[in-house]
A protein has these predicted regions:
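Loop/turn-rich, solvent-exposed surfaces of beta-rich toroidal or solenoidal domains
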Residues: 286-337
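Sec-dependent signal peptide cleavage junction
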Residues: 21-40
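Blade-loop segments of beta-propeller domains
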Residues: 139-179, 348
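Structural signature of eukaryotic scaffold interfaces centered on beta-propeller domains
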Residues: 104-119, 157-175, 219-240, 299-312, ...
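Beta-propeller blade signature
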Residues: 132-142, 185-201, 249-274, 325-337, ...
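Surface-exposed loop and turn segments in beta-propeller and other repeat-based domains
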Residues: 85-105, 143-155, 198-225, 264-300, ...
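Beta-propeller domains
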Residues: 69, 74-105, 113-154, 320-342
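Short glycine/acidic-enriched loop and turn motifs that connect beta-strands
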Residues: 128-131, 168, 177-183, 245-249, ...
Length: 376
């Protein structure tokens, strides 16, 4: 990816921002199986993890690849039709998006999967095979110029990069532990990472949460984990775990971040730095959870490219592959009761057939999102 853009613009009751190519774009939308695990396993994985499941649109690099797969597997095509999201939003705004930042000087052209916009720096994460690269870019007006990076080994593919401070130290929540069963190498765990310029670190070297199939109030498994992501509320008090299993079912779980950080502190200095979501302490930190399956899943453009959580517990989901117009869904509610409040379709001249949505961030009154221009 050579251009990433962020767009930032108020448009009535809806606002947008975005990232395109090696540019960053952002948008802000304001619209009014089931088996309990008895013991902790010796490894940081569930026995079913890595079991291949259905392939969906996000498992392919291009729409053409996905279409060819469906043509070769007609039985899969009918299954995917049944699973396609059919839930309807209460509102369908079309906010105008505005270019906000352009990322310059990145040493590699891989797509930026997620950005974090701070006051001085923009951090961007790119995947290369099983590994990821986390780069720090200095903000200078409407540009952000590459400064340094760290290599994240075996972290896999994720859209999680949530900055926070804990005990006076700056960290990121990130997706980690690549799922090698899938071409996209989806991440299957959520970890706490300290940025260290010039360093190479393996996912086993950071404290993290494993067994995310059990990340819920009941302590029951959703099944074999395919991919996970997370979203931190703006005030840092709550974190949302988003988990998809290999059948496509999705689990949303809300946690008290102070309690989760306390659990990670316990393993920080140990050789095995994972905390299973099956422990009583992690279960107690879960405040609510719910699931979506089949055509009831909220997947804009039948795609998931990132999630965010507001202080008011609203959930924002961005979706769209190349050839899709970016869409942002907003779910409102609390606990396990949510409604599909809005589906926004941001408007911008650069949203052509080669634009792919990448990541989302809430910042002030705006929602920032990335657009990867695959033609660059």
């Amino acid at each position: 990816m050579k251009i990433k853009k962020f767009i930032n613009k108020v448009a009535g009751a809806t606002m947008c921002a975005m990232i395109i190519g090696t540019t960053v774009v952002s948008v802000n939308v304001k619209a009014n199986a089931e088996t309990s695990m008895k013991t902790t396993e010796a490894l940081d994985t569930h026995v079913d993890d890595g079991v291949a499941g259905i392939l969906e649109k996000d498992d392919f690099d291009t729409q053409d690849e996905y279409q060819k797969y469906l043509e070769k597997h007609p039985q899969i095509q009918s299954q995917e039709v049944n699973m396609a999201s059919r839930v309807s939003a209460n509102k369908n705004p079309k906010p105008k998006a505005t270019l906000r930042y352009k990322i310059k000087g990145l040493p590699r052209t891989a797509a930026i999967q997620k950005t974090y916009i701070g006051s001085t720096y923009i951090y961007v994460i790119q995947r290369s095979g099983l590994d990821s690269y986390l780069s720090r870019c200095v903000i200078n007006g409407s540009n952000a110029v590459y400064k340094d990076e760290m290599k994240l080994q075996n972290f896999g593919h994720g859209q999680t990069l949530e900055w926070f401070e804990y005990n006076g130290i700056a960290y990121f929540w990130v997706t980690c532990k690549a799922n090698e069963t899938y071409k996209e190498k989806w991440g299957t765990q959520i970890g706490r990472l300290k940025y260290q310029a010039g360093q190479t670190i393996d996912y086993t070297q950071i404290p993290r949460f494993s067994h995310l199939s059990y990340a819920n109030k009941s302590g029951s498994s959703i099944g074999s984990v395919k991919r996970v992501d997370a979203a931190l509320s703006s005030n840092g008090k709550k974190i949302l775990f988003w988990v998809m299993d290999n059948t496509g079912e999705i689990q949303y779980s809300f946690y008290n971040t102070s309690k989760l950080n306390a659990e990670l502190d316990k393993v920080q200095s140990q050789s095995s730095k994972y905390v299973p979501c099956t422990t009583s302490e992690v279960k107690a930190a879960c405040t609510a959870s719910f699931r979506q399956s089949g055509s009831n899943r909220v997947l804009p453009n039948n795609s998931f490219q990132g999630v965010e959580l507001s202080d008011a517990d609203s959930i924002y989901i961005i979706g769209g592959k190349a050839q899709d117009k970016p869409q942002i869904a907003k779910l409102t509610g609390s606990g396990s009761n949510y409604k599909y409040e809005a589906l926004a379709t941001p408007v911008h001249d650069n949203f052509g057939n080669s634009a792919e949505s990448e990541g989302i961030q809430l910042k002030g009154d705006y929602v920032y999102f990335g657009i990867n221009d695959t033609s660059k």
